[in-house]
Amino acid sequence: TEIGAVRSPEDVWFDEYGNLVWTVKDPDDGIPDDKKRIIYFDGHTDTVRALRDQWHQKTDGSIDAYDGVLKLNGLAHDFLRGELGYLPPDDEWDNLIFGRGSADQLGGVISQIIATKIALELVKEGALKGTIIRAYATTAEEDNDGAGPMYLMNKVLPGSGPELVPDVVILSEGTGDAGKGALGIYRGQRGRMQIEVTVT
């Protein structure tokens, strides 16, 4: 509530798995919750291993996994371009955030917080009319292949009312598209299948 991303402290909590959950809606729009559209935001709060020594070595000491950019002069542009696929123009580097999870994936979680704040600021203009935003900052995605969201799919949503089941899902995972620049929006799903094969 301090930054205005929810109406009240009751609108934000940790679920039993440890996912941070917050909701926003317009309680005065005259539409019952079970008739509203549900927009689901999801972003994860964990990151992969830092590999601090490797990054420090491969960037000639110009980047530290925890401290960010240590020196812009002599930054290993070729290495970074190879790792990231895209580098912004040099005159934009002062506006970048470097550090653990800044791109994967805390920047996305921050965008969810800002989106709900803006939606609440625009409630008088109808931004939330007939809509509930359910936002999640989930855990255990990097190291457990999506265990935080799977908790929702397996434990929260089955048998729940329509006020919980999403009509649309927005994943705030940074996608990027080196051909288009630093940002890109992807629609769809990469897909996944788990199968067990028994050979006799």
Map each language-model feature to its residues.
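Intrinsic structural disorder/low-complexity segments
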Residues: T47, A115, R190-R192
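Sequence-level motif detector for i,i+2 pairs with an aromatic at +2
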Residues: Y17, K36, V165, R192-Q194
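Conserved beta-strand segments that form the floor/walls of ligand-binding pockets within enzyme
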Residues: Y40, R134, T198
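Hydrophobic residues positioned within well-ordered beta-strands of beta-sheet architectures
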Residues: L20, I133-A135, I195
